[in-house]
Amino acid sequence: MDNGGSVLSLSAPHFPYSATILRRHSPVASISFSLKQPPPQPPEPPESPPDLRRPEKSIGSSSSSSSPSPIPSPKTPLKINPLKGLTNRSSVSPLVQSEVSSKVSSFGSSLASKLRLSSKLSPPPPPPPPPPVEETTQFRDEFRSDTKPPEEETRNPQQEFRQEGKIFVGNLPTWIKKPEFEEFFRQFGPIENVILIKGHHEVEKNAGFGFIIYAAEKSAMKAVEFDGVEFHGRILTVKLDDGKRLKTKAEQRVRWVEEGEEDTKMSNKSSWHQEREGSRKSLQRILDTNGDNWQAVISAFEKISKPSRTEFGLMVKFYGRRGDMHRARETFERMRARGITPTSRIYTSLIHAYAVGRDMDEALSCVRKMKEEGIEMSLVTYSVIVGGFSKAGHAEAADYWFDEAKRIHKTLNASIYGKIIYAHCQTCNMERAEALVREMEEEGIDAPIAIYHTMMDGYTMVADEKKGLVVFKRLKECGFTPTVVTYGCLINLYTKVGKISKALEVSRVMKEEGVKHNLKTYSMMINGFVKLKDWANAFAVFEDMVKEGMKPDVILYNNIISAFCGMGNMDRAIQTVKEMQKLRHRPTTRTFMPIIHGYAKSGDMRRSLEVFDMMRRCGCVPTVHTFNGLINGLVEKRQMEKAVEILDEMTLAGVSANEHTYTKIMQGYASVGDTGKAFEYFTRLQNEGLDVDIFTYEALLKACCKSGRMQSALAVTKEMSARNIPRNSFVYNILIDGWARRGDVWEAADLIQQMKKEGVKPDIHTYTSFISACSKAGDMNRATQTIEEMEALGVKPNIKTYTTLIKGWARASLPEKALSCYEEMKAMGIKPDKAVYHCLLTSLLSRASIAEAYIYSGVMTICKEMVEAGLIVDMGTAVHWSKCLCKIEASGGELTETLQKTFPPDWSSHHHHHGFLDQVSDVDSDEDDVDGEDGEDDEDVNSVSDLLSPYK
């Protein structure tokens, strides 16, 4: 707080709780902390080209100002606890009665026994209603027909003045700026120029329409298809330019040259008729009583004929609190243009505007100007600078200005200490934060409750539960009453460390203490359940919150949509989006991301593309993550041509691909064995200056191993070594799998030894691939030894390991060994799948006619298990098994009758066509072929391509 008593508002965007009014008795200082996120930085007003201003128009000396407004945070009071059914009410809280009371503070010296705080929070201003669109003046005069040649009378004026690639966009919000206008329409193609028509009477607003000139006519046609799209609450009119505006400008120029007429309608209306003193009082009264109404504040200021330093200072401070640094600077320069010298307080307000807008370079420029003019920097000025760097995450710069403040000012206050502590908590440097707390206490400065919250938030970020509880205990010992912010810190701590049960316990303690939840605490609870994939409790918390009368915001809706997508209920997720729109909540890109990914993951690319188009029509500009979601789905479906089309569309929209985009494309080509394309996109990734990581090399190695180019794979590993990229178990598994496909046991064994030397532990996938290599080489003794070795190391075989072993015994024509392996697998509690039954039954049927009786009984047992499991084989497998049955039971029997129950339903119609059996020379089954050729599918149990997907 400065000497004049002005209250600074500082936002802390990383706080996990919402703003709450905190009061203490007999405050010694008054500091206003705003825990809300700062409003978005408004873009600079666009400069209108010279040819867009009418020559007759005279601009007045004053124009009304507008300011972008952040979204307000509604404060709906809670009536009852919505989490009443989630915990046991009769249980006693160990958090308050046992666990918290048993912790001892070990990181700071003792605090003062009586600490006081007066905190006053101001909600952000409401969004302004969209002003009516200014209609452009239409000139009614037309060219004289007698001055035109006869051939020009039949010429179409629309074709004469129309420009290719130019579109008209109408019904724009009058407050929109050129950068936002250009950013939205940039997604349809490269833009040559953007023309945003300024308002006639308010030049800082637009007239409600503008023009986009694309480099290609195709881009303009594509943009016109989105006529009727929603853009910041307005339904846009998008159509090709008809040349009418250029024709009107030509008519205006002709009249100006020939007649010299002045359009009296363009003259600005004067607003200087009110009394100066009454206007000043009106401004002060509005700032005191209705400061959130930005329209009323600006209107009152514009009515002052000759503002003084006081009025200018009030307006700079008003814009500074809102983070509107451009209008704050404009007001500051208007003051200097009148010959008024700024004071330290006005400079501080301007610096505060830049700090809230995250433009610390301009803030430091103001500091240099202050020093050049000999204006002393107050402690409040230093506090604002330190707070600005803290919010920007620049702890070193914050330390520099904090040290300078200590050198210049002998005594510091809790405000500047709170900001420097916040800077180090956000960078997870808790040792430095603890040292600052000790330093503050040694100076005799009482820590307000906000600093306790900052420390608890810092320990939450580093997941230090013990010290977080120590701070909570110390807070209560110093006489502070825990608020919803305090309990919100604890809830956030427990949800971050995965202890949702303790978070529920904190919620119960809140109810006992009479503290009600807010949107932030509810959001933390829902996030905790979503992380644990406990969808039922997440929805229960959401429903209880709605019953309490609280209105969810966009962030909460996004969390619920993610929960619906996580449980696979995509229809309910889309329904929730529609509910958001009915409640006038504007969906964001994050709203649609989980829906697009959900449909893509399930393989429904048609619906995924529909949601992508729906997102665009809602006014959301696609990001690289949105495009990556579509590409991931297409790659999983192996639709590489469509994936490349999405990549091209992404480039056309001006969205730069990242490492994940190219890596996913490379993985797609690797899955189909197209090594050339994989290397092509690897080169493209490097040419664009993107970082090459281990995931990129894994995709390249999979492409080489899939196509059998092991020498190329070795060259890739050498390049990895040259770049100092260590090989992990996934890289080794890919290489071992590549040699296993070729049956090269020696190379695979060498890689396993190399793994052990480098300290990389072989896992189940490594051993499974090596067993596959042994099976293909016919070395089943070594495969058996590998099983014993992995069991000795505590690595248990899984179903893919046993499937590989069964295939090996089948390939070695030892069905009795395969049957023994099958029995061992069931004894370990592993449930057989379709691939196991296929491999085992094929092997047994091939030997049943000449083998012992127990093999025949084994075939019967397996057939009955398949029938009970409801497994149906494909037609190729059925034909092959039928040929084996003819050798065992030529005239049919119990085995034939049982086995035919696993055949396809249309088997009987094919069975009567005897010629069909003669034409079948090979077996084409659902699962991998027993012979295990090098060109096996990705479902091959030895392939590691599907094993890497969880890692990615």
From Swiss-Prot:
Molecular-function annotations in GO: mRNA binding
Basic and acidic residues bias (residue ranges): 137-163, 259-280
Keyword Zinc: no
Name listed for the protein in its UniProt record: Pentatricopeptide repeat-containing protein At5g04810, chloroplastic
GO (cellular component) term, any one: chloroplast
Name of a matching Pfam family: PPR_1
Ranges of biased composition (kind: Pro residues): 37-49, 122-133
Composition-biased stretches (Acidic residues): 921-941
Alphabetically ordered keywords of this record: Chloroplast, Plastid, Repeat, RNA-binding, Transit peptide
Biased composition (Low complexity): 58-68
InterPro entries (UniProt xref): Nucleotide-bd_a/b_plait_sf (IPR012677), Pentatricopeptide_rpt (IPR002885), RBD_domain_sf (IPR035979), RRM_dom (IPR000504), TPR-like_helical_dom_sf (IPR011990)
PPR repeats: 308-342, 343-377, 378-412, 413-447, 448-482, 483-517, 518-552, 553-587, 588-622, 623-657, 658-692, 693-727, 728-762, 763-797, 798-832
General function of this protein: May play a role in the plastid ribosome biogenesis.
Origin: domain of life: Eukaryota
Gene for this chain: PPR4
SMART domains xrefs: RRM (SM00360)
UniProt-annotated location(s): Plastid, Chloroplast
The UniProt record lists the keyword Acyltransferase: no
Record-annotated RRM domain positions: 167-238
Family as reported in the entry's similarity comment: Belongs to the PPR family. P subfamily.
Cited CDD domains: RRM_SF
Chain segments carrying region Disordered: 30-95, 115-163, 259-281, 918-952
GO biological process: embryonic pattern specification; leaf development; RNA splicing
Transmembrane segments: none
